[in-house]
UniProtKB/Swiss-Prot annotation:
Homodimer. Keywords: Cytoplasm. This is PF03932 family protein CutC. NCBIfam families: PRK11572.1 (NF008603).
Length: 248
């Protein structure tokens, strides 16, 4: 049966995902940045209370995936911490300035991760040649690759995703970016073994007093009064589609 991974940005989101049928969680902070390394407090609380597999993201900042030496050193320290806390896997990715997988740094990441399953995230979609990148990641021992098929969303990139799947069984190709209940069946019919979804919704902040003339973000248009949450019903609907597909 296809595996459903849900991207979660808090302890509450992780609990919601687990209760509604998620098979695995990608744990992140900072949804507006596309996911950054969670805090130690969040890591510890999720490790204590969530029983399904959780893979924290290791990403020190938003933007591109070419990191300074200092940023990369911090990533290795975060990997060691995630390993010490007992997580079964992690999610990360590093590129060269030319859009290739940085194999030298990936070797160091794999050494630091040890027995943990490593997912190479959507830095893959920024690679100049996805098929060369996939071969390099297979050689590195990466467990899976999260990809939208190098398009803005996975529905647009499904043909490339299918080509990547045809390259072999490892790494596993996990489709993500815009995967929802209304298009999930297309991925299952295409033979995708793992899917990744945020299943998220923006909820209004409970704050009654609001200083509308002030923002904590450099983006003065940023909405300070909405919060990202995993929608349990969306997770359950997607899991139901997967179960019914398996029963065919």
């Amino acid at each position: 049966m296809a595996l459903l991974e849900i991207c979660c940005y808090s302890m509450e989101c992780a609990l919601t995902a687990q209760r509604n049928g998620a098979d695995r969680i990608e744990l992140c902070a900072a949804p507006k940045e596309g996911g950054l390394t969670p805090s130690l407090g969040v890591l510890r609380s999720v490790r204590e209370h969530i029983t399904i597999p959780v893979h924290p993201i290791i990403r020190p900042r938003g933007g591109d995936f070419y990191y300074t030496d200092g940023e990369f050193a911090a990533m290795l320290e975060d990997i060691r911490l995630v390993r010490e806390l007992g997580f079964p896997g992690l999610v990360t990715g590093v590129l060269t300035v030319d859009g290739d997988v940085d194999m030298s740094r990936m070797e160091k990441i794999m050494t630091a991760a040890g027995p943990l399953a490593v997912t190479f995230h959507r830095a893959f979609d920024m690679c100049a040649n996805p098929f060369n990148a996939l071969k390099n990641l297979a050689d590195a021992g990466v467990a899976r690759v999260l990809t939208s098929g190098q398009k803005a969303d996975a529905a647009q990139g499904l043909s490339i995703i299918m080509e990547l799947i045809a390259q072999g069984d490892a790494p596993i190709i996990m489709a993500g970016a815009g995967v929802r209940a209304n298009n999930l069946q297309n991925f299952l019919d295409a033979g995708v073994r793992e899917v990744h979804s945020s299943a998220g919704v923006l909820l209004p902040s409970p704050m009654r007093y609001r200083n509308q003339g002030l923002s904590m973000s450099a983006d003065i248009q940023a909405d300070e009064y909405s919060r990202y949450r995993v929608e349990g019903a969306a997770v359950a609907e997607m899991k139901g589609i997967i179960v019914r597909h398996q029963a065919k």
